[in-house]
Regions:
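Non-catalytic, hydrophobic alpha-helical segments
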Residues: 45, 49, 64, 75, ...
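Glycine-rich "substrate-gating" loop/helix at the edge of Rossmann-like oxidoreductase active sites
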Residues: 4-11, 32-42, 66-68
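Amphipathic terminal alpha-helices
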Residues: 129, 137, 141-157
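Glycine/proline-rich active-site loop of Rossmann-fold NAD(P)-dependent oxidoreductases
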Residues: 7-17, 52-62, 68-71, 84-87
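A short C-terminal helix-loop "cap" of Rossmann-like NAD(P)-dependent dehydrogenase/epimerase domains
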Residues: 19-30, 85, 110, 128
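Terminal hydrophobic/aromatic helix or amphipathic segment near a protein terminus
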Residues: 81-124
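A conserved pocket-lining segment of Rossmann-fold NAD(P)-dependent short-chain dehydrogenase/reductase
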Residues: 20-40, 48-52, 56, 63
Length: 157
């Protein structure tokens, strides 16, 4: 099984970093980039693991993800919805942001071309194969529901 980014209560990593930026009201300057990323909620992962352990499944490579891929802008909107805040997404033109990243690379700043690429690239996987072998029409938890559950756990810290 090959899960993409797994999240849930106690999560540590890039989702926490984005949550901290958004919760402080810092604007997201990359709103012009409409990337999409797959996520895996811990609830859906547990459902799939239980299915793999209790059903006879042919060995193979199975990608694991929630049913929907979200853009970073949509993810920020989910975070803000949980926090009761208005999303602060700036749509600075892509060309301007690319130039800023190049300058950041020359000056050894945090925003450089490599980091920019990681922030705006797509990473979408299909969970159709794993759902088919387990007889699932859809995952039990939507991407938004799973992320809301995770973000609520950040709020409690």
């Amino acid at each position: 099984m090959r899960p993409c980014m797994i999240h849930g209560p106690g999560n540590k990593g890039n989702l926490n970093l984005l949550y901290n930026v958004v919760s402080k009201g810092i604007p997201w300057p990359l709103g012009a980039f409409e990337n999409h990323r797959s996520f895996t909620s811990i609830q859906n992962l547990c459902t799939v693991i239980e299915g793999l352990l209790t059903q006879k499944v042919v060995s193979g490579i199975y990608h694991m993800a929630d049913d929907e891929a979200l853009s970073t802008n949509e993810l920020i909107e989910v975070i803000c919805e949980v926090l009761g805040k208005k999303a602060n997404i700036w749509c600075i033109p892509k060309g301007v942001m690319n130039v800023m990243a190049k300058i950041g690379g020359w000056l050894h700043l945090p925003l450089n071309p490599n980091r920019m690429q990681k922030l705006v690239e797509n990473y979408v996987v299909s969970n159709a194969k794993i759902k088919k072998v387990l007889g699932l029409q859809k995952m039990p938890v939507s991407a938004k529901e799973g992320l809301t559950y995770t973000i609520l756990s950040f709020k409690k810290r």
